[in-house]
């Protein structure tokens, strides 16, 4: 028995990469197995740590991404040590990519599981996931950190069913001198009203997002998911808190839990610690109840992978009729002895198991970062005169200013009348819309349809404006990065 133990000593668990590992090239330390999906700022891969045999997740981030946000994500993960938060092991620079090595959660995100099974979650399943998520939020908030992007796509499950918070690409740190933040950041449908209004917010902004996430897990998508994100941004602060579409389907405890999360006044909203004592959470069952849905989702994923592999093999067979093949993986170039290697991908976006930004919605929402220039330094805040009326968010002010400029440029050049081209519509300067009564329904519908393209164009102009500011900074960072071997 002793001989067996000596021959097969148990491998130690990876806790953090040591200095020796960090001075090597990442390929010497890890074997990358497959692509898992897309996270904030980069792609996520499944890999194995050669020394311990432990499976890890590696986020590969191009250096042209927002390096400041990436470094912030690393910094926050480094400071966290909780079973309810994804662990960080270390980072590397490799060619034009930053490799961030993190804990691997084999079951993927909650939104992945919903999508793979094409089925929403039961109350028992939701309660168990919320309990772990609240413990993660309680830990983060105790550390004075705000996640700022809580949603089903950022809650990962390991194969045992333990939920962990992930994707800290937009997380923020609160300091003693900065009780509230004033930047609009997060994913639109999950945003708290005070975040959208830019009136300052603290940790309980995550609680609002958690309430929206609870509805998302129950109904498959968050409230307002069927409308344009920019319209949702107008509606969230002005409308009453959202509720279930069919309240009669859900228990009083679950309904009350969501109600406690979705209180519009942040001062009256419950904290993570308080919600852990809520009857809905206290009655949560163990993680074993999640194993069936995890196994079902992983079976669906495996079948999709096998189907995709068959398609790849079939394509290879069809191509072999035209090219000389060697073992199905080597395509010999005509007239060239050495040939050309063809790498066959066995994964597509449909088989992801980590974080995908389409979540459970039909459109790719991603993470919206508005007014991002205030994030360049953690301590920067916008202060408002509290004696003034609540100011409009900066992105709304931009749209209004842009429209005024268009009105001035077009004043006197057009007369309100039937629509000829939906793209040339100008809002009347005097705000008089009486002339609309004389238009046909068809003209009105055309003008309504013209609003979204106009808005998208203005958003793109904003993006280009900030990109022109960011690029010189990114160029300087890349120049410095070239002088480093490892991060």
Swiss-Prot record:
Domain (Protein kinase) ranges: 30-281
Protein name: Serine/threonine-protein kinase 4
Entry annotation: catalytic residues: 149 (proton acceptor)
Underlying gene: STK4
Subcellular location: Cytoplasm; Nucleus
Keywords noted in UniProt: Acetylation, Apoptosis, ATP-binding, Coiled coil, Cytoplasm, Kinase, Magnesium, Metal-binding, Nucleotide-binding, Nucleus, Phosphoprotein, Serine/threonine-protein kinase, Transferase
Residue span(s) of domain SARAH: 433-480
Similarity remark: Belongs to the protein kinase superfamily. STE Ser/Thr protein kinase family. STE20 subfamily.
Modified positions (N-acetylmethionine) in chain numbering: 1
Phosphothreonine: modified positions: 3, 183, 340, 367, 387
Residues where Phosphotyrosine is found: 433
């Amino acid at each position: 028995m002793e001989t067996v133990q000596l021959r097969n000593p148990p491998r130690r668990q990876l806790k953090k990469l040591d200095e020796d590992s960090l001075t090597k090239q990442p390929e010497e330390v890890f074997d990358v197995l497959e692509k898992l999906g897309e996270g904030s700022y980069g792609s996520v891969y499944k890999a194995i740590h050669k020394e311990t045999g432990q499976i890890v997740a590696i986020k590969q981030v191009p250096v042209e991404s927002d390096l400041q946000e990436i470094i912030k994500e690393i910094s926050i993960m480094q400071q966290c040590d909780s079973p309810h938060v994804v662990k960080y092991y270390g980072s590397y620079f490799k060619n034009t990519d930053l490799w961030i090595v993190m804990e691997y959660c084999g079951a993927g995100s909650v939104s992945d599981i919903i999508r793979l099974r094409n089925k929403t979650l039961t109350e028992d399943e939701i309660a168990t996931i919320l309990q772990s998520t609240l413990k993660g939020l309680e830990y983060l908030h105790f550390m004075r950190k705000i996640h700022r992007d809580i949603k089903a796509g950022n809650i990962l499950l390991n194969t045992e069913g333990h939920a962990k918070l992930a994707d800290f690409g937009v997380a923020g740190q609160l300091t003693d001198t900065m009780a509230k933040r004033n930047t609009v950041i997060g994913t639109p449908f999950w945003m708290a009203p005070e975040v959208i209004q830019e009136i300052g917010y603290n940790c309980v902004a995550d609680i609002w997002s958690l309430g929206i996430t609870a509805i998302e897990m129950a109904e498959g998508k968050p409230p307002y998911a069927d409308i344009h994100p920019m319209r949702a941004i107008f509606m969230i602060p002005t409308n009453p808190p959202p509720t279930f579409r069919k309240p009669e389907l859900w228990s009083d405890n679950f309904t009350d839990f969501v109600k406690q999360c979705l209180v519009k006044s942040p001062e009256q909203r419950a904290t993570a610690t308080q919600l852990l004592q809520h009857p809905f959470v206290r009655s949560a069952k163990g993680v074993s109840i999640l194993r069936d849905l995890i196994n079902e989702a992983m079976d669906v994923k495996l079948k999709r992978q096998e189907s995709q592999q068959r398609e790849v093999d079939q394509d290879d067979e069809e191509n072999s009729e035209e090219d000389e093949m060697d073992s199905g993986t080597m395509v010999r170039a005509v007239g060239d002895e050495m040939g050309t290697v063809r790498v066959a991908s066995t994964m597509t976006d449909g088989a992801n198991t980590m974080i995908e930004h389409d979540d459970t919605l039909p459109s790719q929402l991603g993470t919206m970062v508005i007014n991002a220039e205030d994030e360049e330094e953690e301590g920067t805040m916008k202060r408002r005169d509290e004696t003034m009326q609540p100011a409009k968010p900066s992105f709304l002010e931009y749209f209004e200013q842009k429209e005024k400029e268009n009105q001035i440029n077009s004043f006197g050049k057009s007369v309100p009348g039937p629509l000829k081209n939906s793209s040339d519509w100008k809002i009347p300067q005097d705000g008089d819309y009486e002339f609309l009564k004389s238009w046909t329904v068809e003209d009105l519908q055309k003008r309504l349809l013209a609003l979204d393209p106009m808005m998208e164009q203005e958003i793109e102009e904003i993006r280009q404006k900030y990109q022109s500011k960011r690029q010189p900074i990114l160029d300087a960072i890349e120049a410095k990065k070239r002088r480093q071997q490892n991060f």
